[in-house]
């Protein structure tokens, strides 16, 4: 029970960080807040037995760190995606549901690498949160699931607040 509660605390801290990231004014600031989220969320997933999720998040830390440092290349991104798919498939114990974090991360990796448009990235965050919602409900990470819904809603607010910038980028 203590590990479960600790996992929920880590999940809540991560959720706060990702919510802040959705209001970031630059791609780099968004990525840094997401790295912070990923660290806490990976620990929470490990404590809850969500190994595919923890792996996916760990690779996302590497991806975002390389992007912040401007060291990401198409080759490195491709290698990270392939590793994620292969190792994620190996660790998957949840059938189709276990692939949702992988799908989420691959789609975000491609989006973050191909567009500087924050509004588009916010839409991809919504897609990701909905996939994570299903995964979190499956591993019974209910507070994380509530967080997924909250992040979806806060990101929608950020999209509405910044809708003028969407057409300009």
Where do the language-model regions lie?
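Alpha-helical membrane-protein topology signature
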Residues: 1-169
């Amino acid at each position: 029970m203590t590990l479960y509660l600790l996992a929920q605390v880590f999940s809540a801290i991560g959720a706060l960080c990702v919510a802040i990231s959705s209001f970031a004014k630059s791609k780099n600031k968004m990525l840094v807040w997401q790295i912070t989220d990923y660290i806490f969320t990976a620990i929470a997933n490990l404590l809850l037995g969500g190994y595919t999720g923890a792996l996916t998040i760990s690779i996302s830390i590497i991806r975002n760190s390389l992007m912040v440092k401007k060291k990401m290349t198409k080759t490195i991104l491709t290698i990270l995606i392939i590793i994620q798919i292969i190792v994620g498939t190996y660790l998957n114990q949840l059938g189709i549901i276990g692939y949702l974090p992988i799908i989420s991360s691959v789609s975000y990796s491609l989006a973050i690498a191909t567009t500087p448009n924050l509004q588009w990235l916010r839409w991809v965050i919504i897609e990701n949160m909905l996939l994570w919602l299903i995964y979190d409900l499956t591993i019974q990470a209910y507070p994380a699931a509530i967080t997924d819904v909250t992040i979806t809603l806060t990101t929608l607010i950020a999209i509405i607040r910044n809708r003028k910038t969407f057409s300009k980028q």
